[in-house]
Amino acid sequence: MISKNVRIAKGAVIVGDVTIGDYSSVWYNAVIRGDVDKIIIGNYSNIQDCCVVHCSKGYPTIIGDYVSIGHGAVIHGCRIEDNVLVGMNATILNGAKIGENCIIGANALVTQNKEIPPNSLVLGVPGRVVRELTEEEIKSIKENALRYVKLSETLESYK
């Protein structure tokens, strides 16, 4: 089920068993394919331009509230808790779990079944926790998600 106040940009593709929560947005040319297992996207989250969100049998994709998935990221069969920023072109693979209040840096690769603890900054290939986030950084993740809610008001919705 896609909430009635979700904003979906022209060119985005959403198929299969997909649930998207209130005030979330899906941007230009993003692909969300719940054709093999389910995909759940929480409230106030955004899937930015050219992202791919997919799953594998037995590996649903679960994305929490206040999550920003940056341009070109690939999110596949993993769990992302609340208040997370996934940087541009990052990849998160099957069975990975990202704890709340994390930043996954641009181009980082979170490998299969990797668990990232809450409040972590992850960088590199393969992705490694490099330090704990500051309170200011944690706050900025939610602020970014809320900026996308506001920005999505300029979209015509193509549900």
Curated annotation (Swiss-Prot):
Function: Probably reversibly hydrates carbon dioxide.
Binding site for substrate: R33, G34, D35, Q48, D49
UniProt name for this protein: Probable carbonic anhydrase
Keyword list, A-Z: Lyase, Metal-binding, Zinc
Catalytic activity, as annotated: hydrogencarbonate + H(+) = CO2 + H2O
Name of the top EC class for this enzyme: lyase
Native source species: Methanocaldococcus jannaschii (strain ATCC 43067 / DSM 2661 / JAL-1 / JCM 10045 / NBRC 100440) (Methanococcus jannaschii)
Protein family according to the UniProt entry: Belongs to the gamma-class carbonic anhydrase family.
Positions of transmembrane segments: none
GO molecular function, one term: lyase activity
Required cofactor names: Zn(2+)
EC number, UniProt record: 4.2.1.1
Residue numbers binding Zn(2+): H54, H71, H76
